[in-house]
Amino acid sequence: MNNHDIVDSEPPGPISQPTHKAPPRTTDTHFHIFGPVERYPLSPKRLYNPCLSDVPAYLQMANTVGIERMVIVQASIYGTDNSCLLDSIAEFGQHRARGIAVVDMDVTPAQL
């Protein structure tokens, strides 16, 4: 396990209606999706325990503020298991979402 204490994240506050929505085609270029731990196991090397922040929760926020496109960044709590990232892109749809994955340093071009 770790040689440190794992910090529990605080849940996000309620989403409030903005005075103005974001301009058309606004893109969120860095956010994480945290799925249920039963489906997406956490790395034993993680530094924190996330609150559930899944695709439906993100879409509620994005639709409220006017975000149309998104780039999901692999969360460190999953190490190099990109399952949550890939499943999230599929759920958002490739017309809307892209992702930044994490791979081992010794990954080969064929594996990519």
Predicted regions and their residues:
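Helix-coil boundary/capping segments in enzymes
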Residues: 1-112
